[in-house]
A protein has these predicted regions:
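Lipolytic serine-hydrolase domain surface
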Residues: 1-69, 74-79, 85, 106, ...
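The conserved beta1-alpha1 loop
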Residues: 93-97, 170
């Protein structure tokens, strides 16, 4: 497989040659495009990733063929517009979660697009995660700092000609996503001019009461959001412990409670 991954990020550009963006926060949003290839030996759900001591082999591993940086939003929007037009007017925005380095986020959206056979234009929104398990508080603050940037990125995708914008958020990325959608609702444009498609909330690392308040401000969506939860999610169990033993949305035991908000709750505990 070959996929052009468009990137909007609140990360700082890295000083290391082998790393494009690092875990530091940037006050400005940066833009790029990465041409990714998926090896023929790829298995669904997996990311075949080269270890440091292994030679580069696109036949065995996910591989970044080239990286294009854009000097400003205008240049990025022009390139994005051409891709969206060539892909039937569809775009998918993926927002990663906690403990995710830049390269891991790129690999993950590539795997999602490859395995789902997605036909639109993939857009990665990557906020400044420290990429370490001990950076939970830092990541939480970075996610909060990225809310306005994600809101503007969604508006940019709409301006670039997308007729349908799908969203997949994972873990702590759901906090950024829900805050951006809440801000869109406050501005009177909660569905991006009828362009909002599927909104998938996968294992959301959000306090249940906070989510309820976000949905109350957003309102019942015209098309139900899709929530994937599991009551045996170890990562969310740790998150809940750090938050004072408060239940997280992604492992909430009362999915029928959430369904009243206009959300299809899919319990994957037994899967």
């Amino acid at each position: 497989g070959r996929h052009d991954i468009f990137v909007a990020t609140t990360r700082e550009k890295s000083d290391r040659p082998a790393e494009v963006f690092d875990g530091r926060r940037s006050p400005q949003t940066s833009y790029a495009k990465i041409d990714m290839t998926v090896p023929g030996v790829h298995k669904t759900g997996e990311i075949e990733r080269r270890k440091r001591n292994q030679p580069v082999d696109p036949g065995k591993y996910f591989f970044a063929q080239s990286i294009t940086g854009y000097g400003d939003e205008t240049a990025f929007e022009k390139a994005l517009r051409a891709s969206i037009a060539a892909n039937g007017g569809r775009a998918l925005v993926f927002i990663h979660g906690y403990n995710t380095a830049f390269d891991a986020a790129v690999y993950r959206i590539t795997q999602i697009v490859q395995d789902s056979d997605y036909k639109g234009t993939p857009v990665l929104f990557t906020w400044a995660s420290g990429g370490s398990t001990v950076d939970y508080v830092y990541d939480n603050n970075s996610a909060s700092a990225a809310r306005d940037s994600l809101e503007e990125t969604l508006r940019l995708v709409a301006r670039a000609g997308a007729k349908r914008i799908d969203i997949i958020a994972h873990s702590m990325g759901n906090w950024v996503t829900m805050e951006a959608l809440r801000q869109l609702a406050i501005s009177g444009d909660r569905d991006l001019g009828k362009r909002l498609g599927d909104v998938v909330l996968a294992s959301p690392d959000i306090d249940v009461d906070v989510f309820k308040s976000q949905m109350k401000r957003y309102g019942v969506p015209d098309k139900p959001f899709i929530l994937f939860l599991s009551r045996d999610d170890r990562a969310l169990r740790i998150s809940g412990f750090l938050a004072g033993n408060r239940p997280r949305l992604g492992d909430y035991g009362k999915p029928e409670d959430i369904a009243q908000l206009g959300v299809v709750a899919v319990d994957l505990s037994q899967v």
